[in-house]
Amino acid sequence: MAKLHDYYRDQVVNELKTKFNYASVMQVPRIEKITLNMGVGEALTDKKLLDNAVADLAAISGQKPLITKARKSVAGFKIRQGYPIGCKVTLRGERMWEFFERLITIAVPRIRDFRGLSAKSFDGRGNYSMGVREQIIFPEIDYDKVDRVRGLDITITTTAKNDEEGQALLAAFNFPFRK
């Protein structure tokens, strides 16, 4: 079992229960899922770029990504409905906790010119979204084999009712918010 999951059960639940005066342990917010999304718009011209993006995301997450397709045709971008334009992975359970631990302890500190993550990236319902400009911050990616530096979106979905609870949950895991 992941260390952060044990830490959540043993420490964070009690901390948040007293802080927000919850009647039941089940009211305490928890991380539901983590979604990784990589948009590969250049895949229209070169299909190999999408395959490389899928391989990168599979290495980062530990599971096979789903290839996302365009929902509608947009003439300005020269895409048609059904064209593959990206890939995504939804992590839950054990893999989610392991990824979250690697994200906080290894990947985020390796971001170039890192001064902390913005606390304004909450969506109003306690979910946190962040963008990563380079996939090479993850140790699973071999820097020499990277064909192109790609970014990805990371969304942490929680059961928190509002941003304050969501921020308290992530801060309890020492999430590196900007001061």
From Swiss-Prot:
Keyword Electron transport: no
Keyword Ubl conjugation: no
GO biological process: translation
PROSITE patterns found in the cross-reference section: RIBOSOMAL_L5
General function of this protein: This is one of the proteins that bind and probably mediate the attachment of the 5S RNA into the large ribosomal subunit, where it forms part of the central protuberance. In the 70S ribosome it contacts protein S13 of the 30S subunit (bridge B1b), connecting the 2 subunits; this bridge is implicated in subunit movement. Contacts the P site tRNA; the 5S rRNA and some of its associated proteins might help stabilize positioning of ribosome-bound tRNAs.
NCBIfam families membership: PRK00010.1
UniProt-recorded name of the protein: Large ribosomal subunit protein uL5
Organism of origin: Actinobacillus succinogenes (strain ATCC 55618 / DSM 22257 / CCUG 43843 / 130Z)
